[in-house]
Amino acid sequence: LRSLVGSEMCIRDSLYTTRDDAWRPDTLWLHRLGTPVADDVKLFHEPDEKYWLGAGITRSRRYLVIAVGSSITSEEYLVDLEGDLTAAPQIVWPRREGVEYSLEHAVVDGEDRLYILHNDDALDFELVSVPASDPQGDRHVVLAHEPGRRLLGMDAFRDFATVEYRREGLERVGLLDYATDAVNDIVFDEPLYSAGVSGNPEWHSPFLRLGYTSFVTPGTVYELDLATRELHLRKQVAVLGGYDPLDYGQKRDWATASDGTRV
């Protein structure tokens, strides 16, 4: 048996990764159902032992994304799932030491676009979009690098995208409008909290599932109604012992360090 890593991804046939002697995922294979394993096709191999290999499917189900990365460097490739799976993967951005990036696929005005979150000359990360047909072409800046606003993640859906970021210690979620590049924060009642996008596998859904917690609110799952912008409580961790959040308060005090930094 081959040394398998992770789970198989069923896309017309089956894709899987195998590992080397150091248990490093290094090779992506295509298995056609009903054929011998000996006939499996090697789609990609990463020889550099500093890099691990992974693969996934965009939420749109349009592209296979092959991701190669180390702790500080990324390189990603695309395979069009509507075409030949054995065609040479299309490189997005060639690897450069110290540059990390991740991508999402969206369709904007009928055009396939890649939204790329990266730290190329952007310590707190920047969000750009490029044509999927020419990822190394002109970059359209969606969210410019802004010191103090750390972009954490982006998820693309059919009609909008989510942007997760941290500012002044709070992790927040905003909704990105493809047409205007405007980001509108999802508003919560508490002044201090941590919020993030939860599992949302569907390309098009009327609801967005969110994870939420604070110093006084236990782990909570909300669904945001995208039409009304109303939050609906779906699940919350029970706290034993007669806990009442109204018996507690939370606040944040700032101090100024000797170099002028607020902490």
Predicted regions located by residue number:
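Single conserved hydrophobic/aromatic residue that forms the stacking wall/gate
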Residues: 1-6, 11
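Short coil/turn segments that connect the beta-strands within blades of beta-propeller domains
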Residues: 12, 60-62, 111-112, 158-159, ...
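Short, conserved, GDST-rich strand-edge loop motifs in beta-rich repeat architectures
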Residues: 16-22, 26
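Polar, glycine-rich mid-to-C-terminal structural blocks
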Residues: 25-69
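Blade-edge beta-strand/turn elements of extracellular beta-propeller
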Residues: 31, 35-47, 82-94, 135-144, ...
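Non-catalytic accessory segments flanking enzyme active sites
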Residues: 51-107, 152-153, 164, 170-176, ...
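Extended hydrophobic/aromatic segments used for targeting, binding, or gating
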Residues: 87-146
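Hydrophobic, well-ordered secondary-structure elements that form the walls
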Residues: 127, 161, 221
